[in-house]
């Protein structure tokens, strides 16, 4: 990941950007701004008007006089599924393949239509299984978000799930 990254929230009613700078005591806010979107530009997390989103991002960058091009974005809405599952315990190097096979039973989308990731929550539960959070996001949605960022001449270094991004921000602030 880039050392300095701007958080870019592509929301249903506005685009928001936040720039933080690491200090000795934590983080300091160096820039924040919001650019409204025309209604129906983004509906249920799906980008309906890519050109309008790109223009809003560019306008926000210009108004805030941001020079940093590396951004972190998050995906939310109906195109993201998060589910806690347990799988038979296996070697770490076999876990990726096992999860890809297991995911078919837990997500309502075709496996070829999604990006899949996971986080191990408990390597061995009392029943000898590995508990994990399975995350699936529609590939088309991820591609649309990445494309508007690139079309705005920015570089997406992180594509996260919105709820996880919020949790990570909370943990950085209060741990």
Regions found by a protein language model. Give the residues of each.
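Non-catalytic, solvent-exposed interaction/assembly segments
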Residues: 1-102, 142-146, 151-155
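Active-site neighborhood for divalent-cation/phosphate handling
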Residues: 74-174
